């Protein structure tokens, strides 16, 4: 993952909404959605819950 994708994925894994992530990182919600699509594909996950599980397993 790119640095930006890691930041977005980390905030989503913490339970933040796309709107909250966008506000925290000064991005548009569309940018967050696009990045999450790439993150899901790269990690082979299909949901926010799977993403959170993936991050929990790594830490």
Where are these regions (language model features)?
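Helix-turn-helix DNA-binding segment
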Residues: 1-37, 41-59
